[in-house]
Structure formats: structure tokens, C-alpha cells
Amino acid sequence: MAEHQVNYASGLPVVLTSVDKLVQWGRSNSLWALSYGLACCAIEMMAAGGSRYDFDRFGTIFRASPRHSEVMIIAGTLCKKHAEFTRRLYDQMPDPKWVISMGSCANTGGMFNTYSTVQGVDRIIPVDIYVPGCAPRPESFQFALMILQKKIRKEKASRKIAPKRLI
């Protein structure tokens, strides 16, 4: 049998771990994603949202507003002029929030080693999951969502605090 943490402060036993598991199950199975397609990887992200891969079974719904999203998916090359706008979108998302960096260009700048390209999205905002490839297949993106779901289930139910600005 699994042991549960019991709190007798109110005089009655209260099981706290079950509430944590319930909240994390709900969060992990209803991922509302802000699709932020910047280049070729966005085409694979759109293909992943189609009926062939059926992302609805994971509870993933693509949203257009950052205020209705908890997962930001950055797919493609991020230019330095666009970096502050990306940070503003991230700041508008409610806590807890997670970021998936999709593709070589989003992860490391890809083949564009120029003055105008951000060499990795993690220089602007914190990234939770990296999806490698140029352009990564929808199956890789699907696997990244499953890893994110496992990560969310392991976190505490308390609200995740966003780190300070990186720029």
C-alpha cells in the first residue's frame, strides 16, 4: 500500500497527496498550447495538429491567445528583433507555464549563425523540452508532449514561479 501524508492540524485526517495527483492529472491532460510557428518547423507542427496524429487524445488544444495557453511551442528561427515580442508573449501566459523548443533553429539557431538570429530560444525564455531535428517529425513532437505530461505529473501542485527575465 502507498503511504499518504496525513495532516491532523484541523482535527480530521486530510489526505494531501491525492489532491496533488488530481491537480497534476488535470494539468497534464489538458495542455492548451500557444502555437508560435516562425519557420519551416511550423509546417510540421500544423501537420501534428491534424487528424492523422490526433493530438486531441492528449488533451492538447492549440490556442491563439497567450492568456489562454499554458504551453508555448516555439517552432523555427527566432530573430533578435522578435525576441522581445516573444518574451512579452511568455510573460502574458498564466502560471504554471511550460515551453517546448521545436527544431534545430529554435534550439541552437540552426544553420543561421548570423548577427540577427537568436542562438537558442533558451537565451530569451526558459525552455522545458527540446525537440531536435530539421524539421522534426510530428511523432517527435508527440513524444515531447508525452515527456512534458510526465514532467507535469511529477511537479508539486503548488503554482510554478516563473524565473526572472533573462535579457
From Swiss-Prot:
GO terms, molecular function: 4 iron, 4 sulfur cluster binding; iron ion binding; NADH dehydrogenase (ubiquinone) activity; NADH:ubiquinone reductase (non-electrogenic) activity; quinone binding
Residues that bind [4Fe-4S] cluster: C40, C41, C105, C134
Keywords recorded for this protein, A-Z: 4Fe-4S, Cell inner membrane, Cell membrane, Iron, Iron-sulfur, Membrane, Metal-binding, NAD, Quinone, Translocase, Transport, Ubiquinone
Alphabetical list of SUPFAM superfamilies matching this protein: HydA/Nqo6-like
InterPro entries on file: NADH_UbQ_OxRdtase-like_20kDa (IPR006137), NADH_UQ_OxRdtase_20Kd_su (IPR006138)
Alphabetical list of PANTHER family matching this protein: NADH DEHYDROGENASE, NADH DEHYDROGENASE [UBIQUINONE] IRON-SULFUR PROTEIN 7, MITOCHONDRIAL
GO biological process, one term: aerobic respiration
Catalytic activity: a quinone + NADH + 5 H(+)(in) = a quinol + NAD(+) + 4 H(+)(out)
Official protein name in the record: NADH-quinone oxidoreductase subunit B
